[in-house]
Amino acid sequence: MISINNLLVQRNGRDALKVASLEIQKGETLAVVGPNGAGKSTLLLALAHLIKPVDGGITFHGKPLKDWDDIEYRRKIAFVFQDPLLMDMSVRDNIALGLKFRGVKKEDALERVIKWSKAMGVESLLKRRAGQLSGGEAQRVSLARAFVLDPELLLMDEPFSAVDPQTRAQLLKDLSKVLAEDHRTTIFVTHNLKEAGKFGDRVAVIINSELKQVDMPEHIKTNPADESVKAFLEEL
């Protein structure tokens, strides 16, 4: 579904991300780990085509991103951030906002909102305003808002790092259940290797702006690709 080859992304004149080769299969959940500032978020921005490489490229369904119409491509993806970024309106209107911009009929939009508000456990909150939500509730709304768009590719940038550990664990459990049933291609950035191992089909390790290793979680722990990966694992 996604192929990355000889990718080089620069920001402010410096190398921000280097990826020699990476294949992401349809329906796969890839967890991305690495130190702060390593280039994890840059990978998501490149996949969203919000920043463009200076060399190499990314293909989506065999077609280079540079050849996709930006509007057409962005209809196929959804982004979930650490900050839910909810608007000052009801939960229902927040979830449906993207559908409104896409011209989805009200009946279809309502059906989708109900489906995903149930899946994310916020159906009882639909009439509540965003400012009245807890951190965990707000992030559940953010997830529902992403899924309601029916994206082919879901990009998640440390979406649960701002909530308490108990809420985080429950959110991950619920999201894992949804993805197990939904089989949606997902790239999930996290600092937590244990979390990555539970959530991801594979784990990608980015260190010093370079993709160092992509493997099954247990293989990375026992067979780090080089000393930088080994040192990163030892610091966790």
Features from the language model and the residues they span:
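Helix-to-loop junction immediately C-terminal to a conserved catalytic motif
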Residues: 48
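Conserved ABC ATPase signature
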Residues: 129-133, 137
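The feature captures the beta-strand-to-loop junction immediately N-terminal to the Walker
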Residues: 33-35
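Conserved ABC ATPase "signature" region
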Residues: 107-125, 176-177
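ABC ATPase NBD coupling module
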Residues: 64-78, 101, 223-224
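Catalytic Walker B motif of ABC-type/P-loop ATPase nucleotide-binding domains
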Residues: 154-158
